């Protein structure tokens, strides 16, 4: 899979987005730094290993960078709710990302059911997204040659998820003992922002259709606002086909006829569910990259955010998604030759099929896969 850079995003500027599309990887680069001008110059980025297998996957990328000479330096910030007393603060993480080209590579942070701070319902993931205003989560669902799927179809669609409001607003309270009220926040401003983002994405990447996913038949005000806003934005893009679909029907359609989708846009909770369902269509959590995008910052992280705690330390996790995240990050940083070469090396290893992790029916370790990618890497 080759990559090319699209340097502007007219209606959502200054946006930053890296995503693969069709047979190539297409990359938006608005707030990214200039490429290195000196031979030995390296660009710095923040890494957040996270919990579970996150550190193993991040360290795999670090080893690939070291062995291949990719001109990147990492500053590590440890964020964890599992090891809360050892965790750095959100403020430190934000400062690190800000001084390191506004970019981070991140593993999954396990959400704890325990309140570490009295009255604080937001987990580290939500606090980080809100601190950086990472309003759009973008996950590209694409069939990789060499991975056998149950449906046998070539899929290529993108999920755009609003991730700063909705059910993730952390507004919960106990009315009386045994009765909990949880509030869902929906605003026209954020619905319009994510809708425009999705339509701009479709326009810039040559896609033909945007599907708004909702439950307005039941949540007539909240999801009704989202749907009406998407319908209004769609009128500004007459060349892009628009349709709406109820979330429960969407799940059925994804399982029965997933090839019908192109760009999907949806509120927060639905996006979380659909991301994971769709990842299962193309090989699972280990093969789908994603990114969280804001006006000034971008965090590259696997599209299916599972810490996989039970596999921690066993070197059995599939690093494909994390390595592809790193490739997208390199394109974002204008290191296109490096990003393209890394992505191609992953594609070659997966297609060849000699080195497969357990989730894909093989016995290779996380390190085995990374070593195979290094062997295939050419620049």
Swiss-Prot record:
Protein name per UniProt: Probable isocitrate dehydrogenase [NAD] subunit beta, mitochondrial
Transit peptide region: 1-31
Annotated residues for binding of NAD(+): 44-72
Residues holding substrate: 129, 161, 248
Keywords of this entry: Magnesium, Manganese, Metal-binding, Mitochondrion, NAD, Oxidoreductase, Transit peptide, Tricarboxylic acid cycle
Cellular location(s): Mitochondrion
Enzyme class, spelled out: oxidoreductase
UniProt-annotated binding residues for Mg(2+): 248
The enzyme's E.C. designation: 1.1.1.41
Swiss-Prot/TrEMBL catalytic activity: D-threo-isocitrate + NAD(+) = 2-oxoglutarate + CO2 + NADH
Family: Belongs to the isocitrate and isopropylmalate dehydrogenases family.
Gene3D superfamilies in alphabetical order: Isopropylmalate Dehydrogenase (3.40.718.10)
UniProt keyword annotation of Magnesium present: yes
GO biological process: isocitrate metabolic process; tricarboxylic acid cycle
Keyword Transit peptide applies: yes
A Gene Ontology molecular function term of the record: isocitrate dehydrogenase (NAD+) activity
Family matches, as Pfam families: Iso_dh (PF00180)
InterPro entries linked: IsoCit/isopropylmalate_DH_CS, Isocitrate_DH_NAD, IsoPropMal-DH-like_dom
Cofactor(s) the protein needs: Mg(2+); Mn(2+)
Cofactor: binding comment: Binds 1 Mg(2+) or Mn(2+) ion per subunit.
Positions marked as site (Critical for catalysis): 168, 215
GO cellular component, one term: mitochondrion
PANTHER family: DECARBOXYLATING DEHYDROGENASES-ISOCITRATE, ISOPROPYLMALATE, TARTRATE, ISOCITRATE DEHYDROGENASE [NAD] SUBUNIT BETA, MITOCHONDRIAL
Assembly and interaction partners: Heterooligomer of subunits alpha, beta, and gamma in the apparent ratio of 2:1:1.
């Amino acid at each position: 899979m080759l990559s090319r850079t699209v340097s502007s995003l007219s209606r959502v500027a200054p946006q930053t987005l890296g995503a693969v599309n069709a047979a190539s990887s297409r990359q938006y680069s608005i707030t990214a730094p200039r490429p290195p001008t000196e031979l030995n110059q390296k660009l710095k980025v923040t890494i957040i290993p996270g919990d579970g297998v996150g550190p193993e996957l991040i360290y795999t990328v670090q080893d690939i960078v070291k062995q291949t000479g990719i001109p990147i330096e990492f500053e590590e910030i440890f964020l964890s709710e599992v090891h809360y007393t050892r965790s750095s603060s959100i403020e430190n993480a934000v400062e690190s990302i800000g001084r390191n080209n506004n970019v981070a590579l991140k593993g999954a942070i396990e959400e704890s059911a325990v309140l570490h701070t009295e009255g604080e319902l937001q987990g580290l993931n939500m606090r980080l997204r809100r601190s950086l205003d990472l309003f759009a989560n973008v996950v590209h669902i694409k069939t990789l040659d060499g991975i056998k799927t149950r449906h046998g179809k070539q899929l290529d669609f993108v999920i755009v998820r609003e991730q700063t409001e909705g059910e993730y607003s952390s507004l919960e309270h106990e009315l009386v003992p045994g009765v909990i009220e949880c509030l869902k926040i929906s605003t026209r401003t954020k619905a319009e922002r994510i809708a425009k983002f999705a339509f701009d994405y479709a326009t810039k990447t040559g896609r033909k259709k945007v599907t708004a996913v909702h439950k307005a038949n039941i949540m007539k005000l909240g999801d009704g606002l989202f749907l009406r806003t998407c319908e209004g934005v769609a009128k500004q893009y007459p060349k892009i086909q628009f349709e709406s679909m109820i979330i429960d029907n969407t799940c059925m359609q994804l399982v029965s006829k997933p090839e019908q989708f192109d760009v999907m846009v949806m509120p927060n909770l639905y996006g979380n569910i659909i991301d994971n369902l769709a990842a299962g269509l193309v090989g699972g959590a280990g093969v789908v990259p994603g990114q969280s995008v804001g006006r000034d910052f971008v965090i590259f992280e696997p599209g299916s955010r599972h810490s996989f705690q039970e596999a921690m330390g066993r070197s059995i996790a599939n690093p494909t998604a994390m390595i592809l995240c790193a490739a997208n990050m390199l394109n974002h940083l204008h290191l296109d030759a490096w990003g393209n070469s890394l992505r191609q090396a992953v594609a070659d290893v997966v297609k060849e099929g000699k080195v497969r992790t357990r989730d894909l029916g093989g016995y290779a370790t996380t390190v085995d896969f990374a070593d195979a990618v290094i062997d295939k890497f050419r620049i």
